């Protein structure tokens, strides 16, 4: 994502060469990537893409990682057939491109996916995880849908509004200390609002020395210095889901 006040490139980082363990399906008007859990525990997680789209191998890798921990996962195409952002594209037109892909206007898609998970996957407990653009979506959805048992927003831009604290269920926020997209003052604002007003469990973690995209767009072996932070963030994500689902 780019900061809305100061659009800047969102580095695609390391694009994984990853085939995936799941399959593509059609859910009403949406294409989606689904991975069934090896253990049918009646739990599912919606994984929400970043600006590079639902087919980015890195996002599917994360969905498969979550699935391996006991959850059926689904990565829907929340752009609904519109092209994802091309990392080699002209960043001067990014703000206009983004206007047609509003992370807070995906209710029709969420309704279809929830129906699919309940009817076709027999999910009784559902959570959500989102990266970048998807992190914004998670924050929005956790303030709107009480049926999401747990949410994890990974470096989603903090939108300043009076109700950013109004979470309905436990939510984990993961940020990077050196994120040029999300200034630490925005993280401090969110921290303050939640501390003053939030009535459910939440946690905000900011990872030292890390940059935007570190959780899902860096290979685990890319740097000995980064690997512990990547591992910890991914572990925290799974632990949060396990605790509240």
From Swiss-Prot:
Active site positions, chain numbering: 132, 179, 212
Residue positions, PTM Phosphoserine: 223
Pfam families: DLH
Keywords, comma-separated and alphabetical: Acetylation, Cytoplasm, Hydrolase, Phosphoprotein
Enzyme Commission designation: 3.1.-.-
N-acetylalanine carried by residues: 2
GO MF terms held by the record: hydrolase activity
N6-acetyllysine modification, residue list: 36
Entry-linked SUPFAM superfamilies: alpha/beta-Hydrolases
Enzyme class, first EC level, given as a word: hydrolase
InterPro entries on file: AB_hydrolase_fold, CMBL, Dienelactn_hydro
Gene Ontology cellular component terms for the protein in this record: cytosol
Protein localization: Cytoplasm, Cytosol
Biological role: Cysteine hydrolase.
Family listed: Belongs to the dienelactone hydrolase family.
Name the UniProt record assigns to this protein: Carboxymethylenebutenolidase homolog
């Amino acid at each position: 994502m780019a900061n809305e006040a100061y659009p800047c490139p969102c580095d695609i980082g390391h694009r994984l060469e990853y085939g995936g363990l799941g399959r593509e399906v059609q859910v009403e008007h949406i294409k989606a990537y689904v991975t069934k859990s090896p253990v049918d525990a009646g739990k599912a997680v919606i994984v929400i893409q970043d600006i590079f789209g639902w087919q980015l191998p890195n996002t599917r890798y994360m969905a498969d990682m979550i699935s391996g921990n006991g959850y059926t996962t689904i990565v829907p195409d929340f752009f609904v057939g519109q092209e994802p952002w091309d990392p080699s594209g002209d960043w001067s037109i990014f703000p206009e491109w983004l206007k047609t892909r509003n992370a807070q206007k995906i209710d029709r898609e969420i309704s279809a996916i929830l129906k699919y998970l309940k009817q076709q996957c027999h999910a009784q407990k559902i959570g959500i995880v989102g990266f970048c653009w998807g992190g914004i979506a998670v924050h929005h959805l956790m303030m709107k849908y009480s049926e999401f048992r747990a949410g994890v927003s990974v470096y989603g831009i903090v939108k300043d509004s009076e109700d950013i604290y109004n979470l309905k269920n436990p939510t984990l926020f993961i940020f990077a200390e050196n994120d040029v997209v999300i200034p630490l003052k925005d993280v401090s604002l969110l921290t303050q609002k939640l501390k003053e007003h939030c009535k459910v469990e939440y946690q905000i973690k900011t990872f030292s020395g890390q940059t935007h995209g570190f959780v899902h767009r860096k290979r685990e072996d890319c740097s000995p210095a980064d690997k512990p932070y990547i591992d910890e963030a991914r572990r925290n994500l799974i632990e949060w889901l396990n605790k509240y689902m």
